[in-house]
């Protein structure tokens, strides 16, 4: 029998953390972070990490598991998430994965072994084709496909496109999970308004100080490449004004949200819910109760 689990996915700033905690309280669950940036200790504001109060309301896994100068990959996530799921289920609780890193979630749920065998001649031919494209053409291709990459540079863009193109040929082991994937969504303009408001709130909470510490000490680390930090570095170096840097941060976050939605719509089987609907989140809870074969709110 496959292990049932819940996934709360969607773009940034739609309330995934709040819903995850509510579901954990209602369905006797524990949360596994599915966010590539929240693994880093000391990076709390820019990653929109669950606050100490929120973490006290529900047990969280895969938060604060790496130092800021360490790397983290989809393989690391799958390995550690599988261990967390086994632990949670062994204690009679429900695993609830909350996050917006589509590649991580897909790799876990669909059983892809990222090191699987692919016809290398096909890969090389496709790579040669990509090498003929300009940087702008590569980045436009990345954006149109909704692919998430940590850093916008040519090498990473080509590698990401190769993975996207040949993912169906990777070794696909039978997954042992039966997920119910909740996708949170809203009108695009409302999501963008929430993003802009959240960036302003992050600044009030100390984002500039957090980003400056990262800039001064670990500017070349993988953790520093995430949206929320790198946009502020030109301000610290004197290349941009604060207003220019913050506008760039908001713009990049909005674009990232668009890519996240594209990924979840095109690459995963998701049940979407409009967060501005009067029926939200009651409709989510009702659907989960049916999925879990239990009466609403009981465990």
Curated annotation (Swiss-Prot):
Q: Which UniProt keywords apply?
A: ATP-binding, Magnesium, Nucleotide-binding, Transferase, tRNA processing
Q: What is the required cofactor set for this protein?
A: Mg(2+)
EC assignment = 2.5.1.75
User: Which positions bind substrate?
Assistant: 12-17
Q: Which SUPFAM superfamilies match?
A: P-loop containing nucleoside triphosphate hydrolases
Pfam families named in the record: IPPT
InterPro entries according to UniProt: Dimethylallyltransferase (IPR039657), IPT (IPR018022), P-loop_NTPase (IPR027417)
| Alphabetical GO biological process terms | tRNA modification
User: What does it catalyze?
Assistant: adenosine(37) in tRNA + dimethylallyl diphosphate = N(6)-dimethylallyladenosine(37) in tRNA + diphosphate
Q: Does the keyword Chaperone apply?
A: no
Q: Where is this site: Interaction with substrate tRNA?
A: 101, 127
Q: Does the keyword ATP-binding apply?
A: yes
- NCBIfam families in UniProt: miaA
- Task of the protein: Catalyzes the transfer of a dimethylallyl group onto the adenine at position 37 in tRNAs that read codons beginning with uridine, leading to the formation of N6-(dimethylallyl)adenosine (i(6)A).
Tell me the HAMAP family matching this sequence.
IPP_trans
Q: What is this protein called?
A: tRNA dimethylallyltransferase
**Organism (species):** Streptococcus thermophilus (strain ATCC BAA-491 / LMD-9)
Gene assigned in the entry? miaA
């Amino acid at each position: 029998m496959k292990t049932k689990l819940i996934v709360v996915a969607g773009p940034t700033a739609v309330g995934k953390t709040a819903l995850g905690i509510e579901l954990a309280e209602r369905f006797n669950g524990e949360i596994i972070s599915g966010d590539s940036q929240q693994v880093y200790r000391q990076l709390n504001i820019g990653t929109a990490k669950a606050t100490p109060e929120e973490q006290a309301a529900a047990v969280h896994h895969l938060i604060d598991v790496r130092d800021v100068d360490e790397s983290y990959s989809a393989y690391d996530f799958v390995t550690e998430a599988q261990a967390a799921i086994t632990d949670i289920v062994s204690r009679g609780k429900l695993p609830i994965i909350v996050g917006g890193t589509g590649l991580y979630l897909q790799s876990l749920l669909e059983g892809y072994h990222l090191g699987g065998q692919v016809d290398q001649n096909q890969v090389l031919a496709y790579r040669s084709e990509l090498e003929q494209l300009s940087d702008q053409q590569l980045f436009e291709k990345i954006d149109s496909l909704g692919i998430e990459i940590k850093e916008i540079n040519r090498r990473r863009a080509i590698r990401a496109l190769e993975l996207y193109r040949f993912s169906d040929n990777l070794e696909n082991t039978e997954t042992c999970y039966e997920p119910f994937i909740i996708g949170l969504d809203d009108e695009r303009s409302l999501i963008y308004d929430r993003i802009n408001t959240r960036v302003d709130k992050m600044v009030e909470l100390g984002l500039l100080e957090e980003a400056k510490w990262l800039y001064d000490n670990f500017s070349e680390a993988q953790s520093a490449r995430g949206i929320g930090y790198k946009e502020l570095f030109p301000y610290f170096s004197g290349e941009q004004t604060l207003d220019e840097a913050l506008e760039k941060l908001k713009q990049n976050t909005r674009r990232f949200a668009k890519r996240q939605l594209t990924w979840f719509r095109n690459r995963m089987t998701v049940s979407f819910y409009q967060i501005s609907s009067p029926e939200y989140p009651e409709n989510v809870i009702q659907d989960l109760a049916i999925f879990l074969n239990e009466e609403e709110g009981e465990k």
